Swiss-Prot record:
Species name: Human cytomegalovirus (strain Merlin) (HHV-5)
Top-rank lineage group of the source organism: Viruses
GO biological process: dUMP biosynthetic process; dUTP metabolic process
Biased composition (Acidic residues): 351-363
Pfam family, one: Herpes_ORF11
UniProt enzyme class: hydrolase
Matches recorded under InterPro entries: dUTPase-like_sf, Herpes_Orf11, HSV_DUT
UniProt entry tagged with the keyword Lipid metabolism: no
Basic and acidic residues biased stretches: 77-88
UniProt pathway annotation: Pyrimidine metabolism; dUMP biosynthesis; dUMP from dCTP (dUTP route): step 2/2
Annotated region (Disordered), positions in chain: 77-96, 336-388
Cofactor(s) for this UniProt protein: Mg(2+)
Protein's UniProt name: Deoxyuridine 5'-triphosphate nucleotidohydrolase
Length: 388
């Protein structure tokens, strides 16, 4: 097959040997070895670094100018018209210059520190886990993500008794929260320093329409929704892989992430984060950690996909409940602690934020419930009192 494709492109085009790992070819740039026409008879070899998927982009391989590039969106400072807002200082402008993500601390059980271009955090107090599967906890930081970027939280917890789920942060004012999944039916105490992780901000990328297959248009934050097509029934303690009728064509330097939505915290479901490979159908692994059968109704948004110009990788971990972790690259955009920032002044307190979020969840559950509660059998037995 490769010989036939090579003959159709150019008899002087030779493909390098494929890597051993079947995932490595998506994360490392393949090398195209071409002979220069103006070279002597002995032939001088030119190594051209081209990230080309031969299955979809074979007709563009001979074009040396073919490259899907990404340009950073115009910074908010350039869009901010100072003439229309005279008398305002730099602290009241939408974003500081150079482009950095402003953030401020809030009272919580976590310590947040700036580490290079990431925010590192760990718990300073004991976190009590009740019999409820997922317990949302504020990370004690608020940040403003500029338009055209997204944030994501990563955790380095290797305990087999609980798992912390990553979260995608949309652009705008965000207050990240920690979702701790209790994998036992008993109370647990998480000691200080056990939960640690990072927050990074990366640029979004929207592929061309011809590069996407069966994907709905993205929302205003450049996130793509993945919905179920039929009713899914997951038994207690069972794991099921859900595939979506969607795919995308490989573009040079592009990576796609799939992360489950937070609304599933009420149904004891764990959606494993996935790196979506090009040329493959989108899919996620759903784990039912409850003792009851859960039914997911059709046309339910199960996960969100986002494209970026930074490449993420897997790290297999045997002691991790999910068996693997997603390792983020080093972000190019850093953070700056500016609690006096005008946009950060609108951040509500953690208590008020939890109340508002609960009310929003109740309203959104009426409009679009991720789990059909009429088909779900919940454990309604008596529960012991929750520890403070």
């Amino acid at each position: 097959m490769l010989t036939m494709l090579t003959d159709r492109i150019d008899s002087q085009l030779v493909l390098s040997r494929l890597p051993r790992s079947r995932f490595q070819r998506f994360w490392e740039t393949p090398t195209l070895i071409m002979k220069e026409e103006s070279a002597p008879s002995s032939g001088s070899i030119i190594l051209a670094e081209k990230s080309v998927n031969m299955r979809y982009c074979v007709r563009f391989a001979s074009d040396s100018d073919f490259q899907t590039t990404f340009t950073l969106p115009q910074s908010t400072e350039e869009k901010y018209d100072k003439e229309q807002h005279p008398g305002e200082d730099e602290a009241s402008s939408p974003l500081p210059s150079p482009l950095k993500v402003p953030y401020k601390w809030m009272p919580s059980s976590f310590i947040v520190k700036q580490c290079h271009t990431q925010l590192a955090f760990y718990n300073k107090h004991i976190i009590w886990l009740s019999r409820e599967r997922k317990v949302p906890t504020s990370l004690g930081v608020s940040l403003y993500i500029p338009e055209g970027f997204f944030g994501i939280t990563f955790y380095k917890c290797l305990d087999a008794q609980f798992v912390c789920m990553p979260e995608l942060l949309e652009s705008g004012l965000q207050v990240p929260q920690l979702d701790v999944v209790n994998l036992n039916d008993t109370f647990q105490s998480i000691f200080p320093g056990t939960i640690e992780g990072d927050i990074g901000v990366f640029p979004c990328f929207v592929p061309e329409p011809w590069q996407l297959m069966n994907l709905p248009p993205p929302n205003e934050h450049r996130f793509f929704s993945l919905r179920t097509r039929q009713t899914l029934v997951i038994g207690p303690g069972h794991t099921q892989t859900v595939y979506f009728d969607a795919a995308y064509v490989h573009a040079p330097g592009i990576c796609a992430l799939i992360v489950g939505v937070r609304q599933f915290s009420q149904s004891d479901l764990i959606i494993r984060p996935t790196i979506w490979l090009p040329g493959t159908a989108a899919g996620v692994t759903v784990v039912n950690t409850s003792h009851t059968t859960v039914c997911i109704s059709p046309h339910t948004t199960v996960a969100k996909a986002v494209f970026t110009t930074h490449r993420f990788t897997y790290l297999p971990v045997g002691s991790h409940p999910l068996g693997q972790m997603i390792v983020p690259p080093t972000p190019d955009i850093g953070f700056t602690h500016t609690p006096e920032h005008a946009l950060l002044q609108r951040t509500p307190s953690p208590v008020d934020d939890d109340v508002d979020e609960t009310e929003e969840d109740e309203k959104s559950s009426d409009a679009e419930s991720p789990v059909n509660t009429s088909d779900v059998i919940f454990d309604v037995g008596p529960k012991p009192p929750r520890h403070p």
